[in-house]
Amino acid sequence: MQNKTLFISKILHLTVFIFTMKRLQLLFITIILSLALFAQTKKTVQALTISTPLTIDGILDEPAYKLATPAKDFVQLQPHNGKPAMQPTEAYYFYDQSAIYVGAMLHDSAPDSIFNYMTERDNTGMADYFGVYIDPYNQGQLAYGFFITPAGVQVDIKAVKSDGDNEDGNWNAVWESKTRITDKGWVVEMRIPFSALRFSEKANKAWGLNMFRNIRRYSSNNSWNLVDRNVSGFIHQEGQLEGIKDIKPPVRLSFSPYLSTYLESKKGSKAEFLYKGGLDLKYGINESFTLDMMLIPDFGQIQSDDKKLNLSPYELYYSEKRQFFTEGTELFNRGGIFYSRRIGSSPKFSADNSLRENEVIDYSPSETQLINATKISGRTNKGWGIGVLNAMSLESNAQVKDTLTGKERNVSVQPFTNYNVTVVDKSLKNNSYVSLINSNVSMFGNPFRANVTATEFQIRNKSKTYAISGKGAISSRGDSTYETGYYAKLGVEKNKGKLQYGISQNMITDKYNPNDLGYLQRNNQMTTEAWIYYQIIEPFWIIRECNGNIWSDHNRMYNPNTLYDNITGGNLNVTFKNNYNFNFNGYYNMDRYDYYETRVKGRFFKFAHFYSYNLNLSTDSRKPLSLYFHYGYAKQPTTDQYQNSGDFQATMRLGQRLQFDYLFSISNTTNGVGYVDKNDSESSITFAKRNVNSMENVISTSYALSNKASINLRARHYWSSAKNNIYYLLQQDGSLMEDLTYTENKDQNYNAFTVDMMLKWNFAPGSELVMAWKNAAFADQNRVETNYWSNLRNTWLNQSNSLSVKVLYYIDFNSLKKKKTT
């Protein structure tokens, strides 16, 4: 009854907040009606139909070019937003029944000064570039980007309208291009097949279009249709491509079978060969939706995670690097309840609870085996976005061994598991939207179930100056009895103009838990957040542009309803005309009553107030040698605890193809205080005063053999140690009392050393050959090393190596059909 009463009180608290937000919104509407609305005429360009395909050779000599009217008069995005571009650009558009053709003349008064660096695919590096964004539905919600550098390096991006615009560089398409540098500048020709786009057969209307050109030596970014930098997002600030009509969407069907082989070795065991094979399939169900299926996937060649020593009560977050889960997954990010790294991650259960007398764990799998994954996603011409993602992993077993008899047996640490995510999203007027999403995890032969349902919305006014946004979610998880929790958030913001600001309130109950298929650091909290932001985008004095913000958070626990902390901070970012950048950020945290550091429900530790600041400086990245410096400092004024941290990064380009990067990071915390241990009954909680030192070295090298082949090497060593000096017992009032009876050694010395070397060759459109070498060594002990080189030698004692070759071949149904017809 007490919990229900507490929950009802929180609902009333949120209701009062909503009522306040409504009154604020009425005030905003009054302000809006008193102001002149921003209006901008969209540019248009006509696409001409052609009967003979253009030859993609970087020469604009076909007769069709004399008949077409080019798109021109580009304007600056940076540094002088809205003023004419420093160099003229003309772009021509054509189409036939299979593709859109783009021909562009990028004039340059100094062709020998064009930044013509060659890089790997999907990376412009520091090269000049030209690109087009095509929005077939002309709704300002989704656009397909095709970019090219003077060296012919292709970059394809899918931009999605969200809170701002998210550019998905993991999206890949198969298209043709050719560039050529002349005495007048450089020339681009593209052939973008309709199979790379999603559009409606019925709609003979204008498509959304914008073009971008970057001239590196001027640090100048330009667009065809004006993109007002005082307005959040760029997709809805597009022009129009007219004239495309009577086009039937092609069959979108492709297969990408792969074969791979691995030679793997670990110290103390024999090297073994592994062979894998599988298939990726993409099928356009209709004009709007695409099926993407992966059978028996192989992720053995992705870059190693940057592992770290984690002394916090929160799970470390690692970004997704598997292409299937990064490409075309923008819909599934609605609601914030999907974290794709859960799929195929480490087993959910441990074999410890299944051990019998005299048994030990002989082997435990580090990850579950994913056997297939399927996603269906798309958006209709009426603005309905629908996505379904499903994945399955096999049962995972640990091996336990009887130390007396030597007998071994398997213990299930995760049954056959099904993961499912479903989302429905509706685009509304003024680039607004509302979404509903559900995630579900079920295990066959196990009663455990986890289910989360969430909604998210953002409503903008006509001028897109103000917005109301919100989220809500309910989680239910368990086996025989289910634990249910709730999440709610509501905010109002002004996100247009030099001055922007916002306020929001969220509430997360103590039983809300989306982490079976999502990621949430902590629940059981209520946060009121307010912020104000100001930007100057026009150059003045020695400054090219600058911006700054001030923010404040008031955090309380949900249960019990007590203060957690109050934080106030700010940020200043300045870019100078010489392309140097300076950043300062800092915050002040009042006394914190931390209920998470203790690892025991209902217990808290009182952190003394502290402040922190960071200084960052980077030099001109256009130069062959560019540098980055960082210094950070944190201090508790009433105690002897403080922290110093620093970073140094250097990037060196040698010629047009070779680049070196070096990063050195160091962090030293003196007399830090944190959790160490607790007894079985959780009545005794041990903290320690400790010194924590961390050091990281990262060396990266990339060499472009051509615009279709590259070699990349990345080596990283991370070393972190925690030396406990004084042990304490946590008291009921959150204070500490020195404990002279605690004798266990809880020091930590952690090392992670990884090497990733990869040769990638795109030997045919959509096809690739990848050769990879991966080396990994990890060491975790309770004896703190003081000498760097002896510590590194000890780390290398337990290494694993993997040498692999993978061939993936792209087969397009339309190409096969065309060859058969011919």
What is each model feature region?
Residues 125-127, 141, 319, 417, ...:
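Short, solvent-exposed loop/turn segments at the edges of secondary structure
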Residues 194-198, 263-265, 440-444, 476, ...:
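A generic structural motif
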Residues 40-425, 436, 797:
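Structural preference for beta-rich elements and adjacent junctions enriched in aromatics
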Residues 369-371, 377, 448-450, 463-822:
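Exposed, low-structure sequence patches enriched in small/polar residues
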Residues 358-365, 409-412, 440-444, 476-477, ...:
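The substrate-binding groove and active-site-proximal loops of carbohydrate-active enzymes
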Residues 226-248, 396-463, 580-622, 643, ...:
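Outer-membrane beta-barrel transmembrane domain signature of Gram-negative proteins
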Residues 1-44, 822:
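Bacterial Sec-dependent N-terminal signal peptides
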Residues 250-251, 378-384, 425-433, 539-544, ...:
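Glycine-rich phosphate/diphosphate-binding loops that line cofactor/substrate pockets in enzymes
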